[in-house]
């Protein structure tokens, strides 16, 4: 019996091995693309930026590729690139969700399987159009690139990312053009370069034509880099300045959890921030304003709740510093019964040394699914009991600007809390409402020493370029930094260390609205027109060949 069991087991294992070996060979180009994309995104150098999707797209232009086969090839690519770039999902599920490691890894695999399905949908749709309208290989490549560009900005995802962000990460000056087309527009340009590289590959047997296209591609890329460099110079004008000191207390995850549960850690955390702020003021006595990260003050800070114990501790520590403070904290309406009402908000406050609210607090609007609210919990409240570790914050009405009056004039701070810095439309709203300086407060402690802190950092800094407003970023564990409207990134804090630093924030008073702020993602119209033209030309050529 044991011998029979061993024989059956070995036979099954061999069959499974042969099956996966065969599939791996079939999808070798899809696997290669997944690796290229995953290792060209933040925090890796963008070494394959303009050809990372090319192997996948060339594969689906082959005559033997069906819609079904193309979809699964795209699925393999998105699974691998997600596994590389978003491996931190498992760590976060374990730390934030307090799930066992086995369940956390399962959550990662599910995330990889379903989160970026727009990639296989784009290649499958491109294949269908190729078969339906008899598109050539080159036309199919550009069709897929344009479909991908449209889908990545409309497909519902938890974390919006694309290849445009690699430009600011790697300091390729083309990123300066984001104030014209946004980083989504730059991503579309990168995708078109991928299609162009694929076209060069398809024409490799025609050496002269392939080399001419490769040369033209290189010249076009160089021209865009040069244009970006020249365009960025226009934002070197400043007529305002404020000195902001950011305090990073490096509060651990368990301490944050205990503070949220109302334990003694609330006082410990408050005093730690005050002590670090006192030391920072001695080091930077010219500071105009202090900035603490998301929920750095782990209690309510509304004007009507300043008599609470921890608010009084905060006030007693702020008074000797004689500086206003921007900090994350919790907020609640005056009419709310704290014991019964659940409308607690994740908020951003601007207070004077006496704790007085200098403007109404900004309450977070773009809540993180499964982190700050549970989808469908309003319709099915029992879900909150099944998943008690998921927070249930109220939703604010942003974007909103906080006004700070100084002897030199008013400064308008445009607040972003955590992942709100990833939404271009949100920051456009802040610029439209007159924000002079953007301030992003966040807590990346849940992600450990993974890729996420660097990804989150540069995806947030990108908003400053789109709207051409300086941005100060205050985090609990790093990376805290600031970027000016001209793209200059100032000093950056270390990860997972106590730290404080002063940033001289130069800005332009009443700065003009950028083209992107005024018109948004206008380029989708161009993408649709070009897509229609490519498909239409392919269809006409096919008809003429038949006739």
Curated annotation (Swiss-Prot):
Pathway per the UniProt entry: Protein modification; lipoprotein biosynthesis (N-acyl transfer)
GO molecular function: N-acyltransferase activity
A GO CC term attached to the entry: plasma membrane
UniProt keyword annotations, A-Z: Acyltransferase, Cell inner membrane, Cell membrane, Membrane, Transferase, Transmembrane, Transmembrane helix
All copies of domain CN hydrolase, residue ranges: 247-515
PROSITE patterns from the UniProt entry: CN_HYDROLASE
Pfam family, one: LNT_N
Residue ranges that the Swiss-Prot or TrEMBL entry lists as coiled coil: none
Active site: residue positions: 294 (proton acceptor), 364, 418 (nucleophile)
Family indicated by similarity: Belongs to the CN hydrolase family. Apolipoprotein N-acyltransferase subfamily.
PANTHER family, per the entry: APOLIPOPROTEIN N-ACYLTRANSFERASE
Protein name: Apolipoprotein N-acyltransferase
Species: Bdellovibrio bacteriovorus (strain ATCC 15356 / DSM 50701 / NCIMB 9529 / HD100)
């Amino acid at each position: 019996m044991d011998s029979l069991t061993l024989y059956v087991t070995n036979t099954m294992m061999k069959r499974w091995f042969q099956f996966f070996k065969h599939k791996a060979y079939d999808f070798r180009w899809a696997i290669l693309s997944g690796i290229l994309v995953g290792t060209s995104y933040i925090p890796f150098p963008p070494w394959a930026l303009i050809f990372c999707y090319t192997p996948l797209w060339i594969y689906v232009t082959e005559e033997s590729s069906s819609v079904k086969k193309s979809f699964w090839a795209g699925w393999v690519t998105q699974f691998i690139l997600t596994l590389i770039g978003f491996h931190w999902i498992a760590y976060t599920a374990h730390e934030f969700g307090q799930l066992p490691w086995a369940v956390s890894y399962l959550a990662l695999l599910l995330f990889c399987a379903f989160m970026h399905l727009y990639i296989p949908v784009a290649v499958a749709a491109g294949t269908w159009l190729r078969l339906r309208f008899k598109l050539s290989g080159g036309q199919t490549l550009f069709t897929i690139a344009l479909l991908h560009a449209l889908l990545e900005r409309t497909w519902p995802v938890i974390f919006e990312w694309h290849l445009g962000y690699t430009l600011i990460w790697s300091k390729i000056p083309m990123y300066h053009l984001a104030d014209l087309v946004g980083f989504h527009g730059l991503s579309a340009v990168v995708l078109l370069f991928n299609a162009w590289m694929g076209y060069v590959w398809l024409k490799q047997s025609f050496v002269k034509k392939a080399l001419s296209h490769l040369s033209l591609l290189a010249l076009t890329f160089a021209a865009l880099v040069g244009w970006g460099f020249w365009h960025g110079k226009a934002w070197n004008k400043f007529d305002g300045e404020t000195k902001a000191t950011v305090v990073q207390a490096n509060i651990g995850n368990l301490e944050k959890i205990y503070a949220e549960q109302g334990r003694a850690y609330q006082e410990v955390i408050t005093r730690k921030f005050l002590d670090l702020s006192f030391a920072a003021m001695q080091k930077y006595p010219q500071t105009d304003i202090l900035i603490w990260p998301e929920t750095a003050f782990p209690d309510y800070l509304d004007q009507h709740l300043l008599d609470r114990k921890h608010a009084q501790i905060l006030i007693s520590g702020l008074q000797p510093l004689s500086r206003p403070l921007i900090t994350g904290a919790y907020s609640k309406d005056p009419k709310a019964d704290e014991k019964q009402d659940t409308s607690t908000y994740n908020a951003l406050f601007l207070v004077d040394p006496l704790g007085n609210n200098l403007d109404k607090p900004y309450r977070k609007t773009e809540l993180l699914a499964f982190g700050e609210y549970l989808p469908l919990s309003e319709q099915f409240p029992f879900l909150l009991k099944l998943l008690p570790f998921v927070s249930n914050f109220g939703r604010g009405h942003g974007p909103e600007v906080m006004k700070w009056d100084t002897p030199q004039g008013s400064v308008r701070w445009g607040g972003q809390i955590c992942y709100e810095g990833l939404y271009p439309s949100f920051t456009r709203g802040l610029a439209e409402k007159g924000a002079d300086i953007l301030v992003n407060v966040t807590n990346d402690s849940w992600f450990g020493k993974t890729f996420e802190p660097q990804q989150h950092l540069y995806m947030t800094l990108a908003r400053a370029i789109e709207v051409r407003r300086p941005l100060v970023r205050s985090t609990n564990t790093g990376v805290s930094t600031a970027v000016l409207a001209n793209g200059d990134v100032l000093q950056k804090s270390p990860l997972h260390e106590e730290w404080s630093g002063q940033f001289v924030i130069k800005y332009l008073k009443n700065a003009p609205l950028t083209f992107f702020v005024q018109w948004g993602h206008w380029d989708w119209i161009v993408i649709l027109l070009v897509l229609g033209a490519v498909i239409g030309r392919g269809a006409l050529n096919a008809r003429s060949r038949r006739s």
